[in-house]
A protein has these predicted regions:
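C-terminal membrane-cytosol helix-exit motif in multi-pass small-molecule transporters
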Residues: 5-19, 215-223
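12-transmembrane solute porter fold
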Residues: 22-192, 196-215, 219-222, 226-227
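Intrinsically disordered, low-complexity terminal tails of fungal membrane proteins
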Residues: 225-260
């Protein structure tokens, strides 16, 4: 399945780049300032988030032997903190640069992974599990809101919908990739450490911590909201729809060679 997926993905890129007259995802969009770095940061952050959620639940149910009902109660903070995090992210947007809001979202998932990875096998819920769950509530909303703003400001009018949709899709890809890679880490550690289930879970969580740290570093170094010096809203459709913000060029001017 992995090989088939890679082949299909490669075929999609070839079609979009060489044959599609009106491509769904113009490859030139990835040449817009900060856009490619943003994509990687978002994917890795959602990977780390999914790892923290999956293995927190795994820890509670398999190590501490919680029932499904107890686990549901343990995750009840999401009902309160989740909506609050959306409001807080919206409040921060006009006051703090989007890349720093994203950094906050990455930072909380770093802490959440560490808190769960370092828990004793048996411990009161309030000591580490509760703060890890509360902190992780902020991550997806902060990252999603900030990424949508940065993506929309990185491309021109015509491709803002495409860029925004891609950010939403990365949530699903990140979750799947995160759990997949972390599961591999967990199984390999258990295999070579005498079947130690808890050690495997800790290793998976530290893997989530590591990729979140990389995402945070990339956010600090390369993710910015591109500056747009245009005044007003240009009326000429060919310019408005093709301009890639921050490059000073139209989309057709930065397309791949075969499209020039």
């Amino acid at each position: 399945m992995l090989i088939a997926s890679l082949v299909l993905f490669g075929a999609f890129l070839v079609w979009e780049g060489k044959y599609a007259k009106d491509p769904v995802m113009p490859l030139a969009v990835f040449k817009a300032p900060t856009f490619s770095a943003l994509i990687l940061v978002v994917v890795m952050t959602y990977m780390a988030f999914s790892i923290s959620q999956w293995y927190t639940i795994t820890w509670l149910q398999q190590v501490r032997h919680w029932s499904v009902t107890q686990t549901m109660a343990g995750y009840s903070p999401f009902l309160v903190v989740g909506p609050l995090s959306v409001g807080l992210a919206a409040w921060l947007l006009p006051r703090v640069a989007a890349q720093w809001i994203m950094a906050m979202g990455i930072g909380v998932v770093i802490v959440a992974n560490v808190l769960v990875a370092t828990m004793p096998e048996q411990q009161t819920y309030w000591a580490q599990a509760f703060p890890a769950i509360v902190l992780s509530c902020f991550s997806p909303d902060f990252v999603y809101v900030a990424a949508q703003l940065i993506a929309s400001n990185s491309v021109g009018r015509r491709y803002q919908g495409v860029a925004g949709s891609l950010i939403g899709t990365l949530n699903l890809y990140g979750n799947s990739l995160g759990i997949g890679f972390a599961g591999t880490v967990e199984s390999q550690v258990q295999k070579y450490k005498g079947g130690d289930h808890v050690l495997g879970i800790r290793a998976a969580l530290f893997f989530g911590f590591a990729i979140a740290v990389v995402a945070l570093g990339m956010d600090f170094l390369w993710v910015r909201v591109p500056k747009d010096n245009r005044e007003g809203w240009e009326s000429r459709e060919d310019q408005v729809e093709s301009l890639v913000v921050g490059t000073g060029h139209r989309l057709d001017e930065i397309e791949l060679p075969h499209r020039r």
